[in-house]
Amino acid sequence: MAAARKAAWREKQDAAILYGAVGLGAVIGGVLRALSSIGAAALLGTGFPWGTLFVNVAGSFVIGFYATISGPDGRIFAGTRVRQFVMTGFCGGFTTFSVFSLETLRLLQAANIPGAALNIGVSVVAWLGAVWLGHTLASRINRLGG
C-alpha cells in the first residue's frame, strides 16, 4: 500500500513539474512577445501589425526546428518537460494568433481591406514557410555526422 501511495505522489509531483515548466515557458514567451511588439511598433510604426507578424513567424520557425531537432530522430535528446517548456509553453506564450485575428478585424473595421488581406496572406505563407524552414534546417543538422 505504501508503494502505491508513493507512486501516486510521484505521479502528482511529475505533473506539477510539467505544468510549472509549461507555465514558465509561457511567461518567458509572453514577455518576449510584448517586447517584440513594442520594438516593432517603435521601428516600423503602427499602421501594420509588424510585431504580431514577427512573433508568429519566429515562433513557427522555433517550433518547427525544435520539434525536429529534439524528435525521435533528432540530434538533441529532450525529455517531455523540456519539450513542453519550449513547444507548448514558450511558443504558445510567444505566438499570438488571437491578436492576429483582432488586428485583422480592426483593419477590416477601418475599411482597410487590402491591409487585412495582406495581413492574412503574408502571415499564413510566412508561418508555413518558417515552420518548413525550421524543420528543414533541423533535419539537415540531424543528418550531420558526429
Task: Please state what every model-predicted region is.
Residues 1-146:
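Membrane-interface helix-loop junctions in multi-pass transporters/channels
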